[in-house]
Amino acid sequence: MEVTDVRLRRVNTEGRMRAIASITLDQEFVVHDIRVIDGNNGLFVAMPSKRTPDGEFRDIAHPINSGTRSKIQEAVLAEYQKAGEDEVNYEEAGAS
């Protein structure tokens, strides 16, 4: 399984969420609402989740092994870093 596309939208919030991403797996399956979170130990990826009636959050979709989780996290965070660099380059070019 490969992450074949990452679409990312940065968000400006007061909280720790920095972006929302959608990923395409093997050009056949899309997972939306993956969040990039600024945690105590740096950025990490949180899978899409839903609040249950008792207030807990349950993942809607998630990898079942650490290798797949790493692939997804690396792809999403690489796109997040790239989007940040593109934003800086755009601002340096005089656009605002």
UniProtKB/Swiss-Prot annotation:
Q: Which Pfam families match?
A: SpoVG
Q: Which residues form a coiled coil?
A: none
**Record keywords:** Cell cycle, Cell division, Septation
Q: Does the keyword Cell cycle apply?
A: yes
The record's annotation in Gene3D superfamilies points to: Stage V sporulation protein G (3.30.1120.40)
UniProt key word Cell division: yes
The UniProt entry, under NCBIfam families, shows: PRK13259.1
Stated name of the protein: Putative septation protein SpoVG
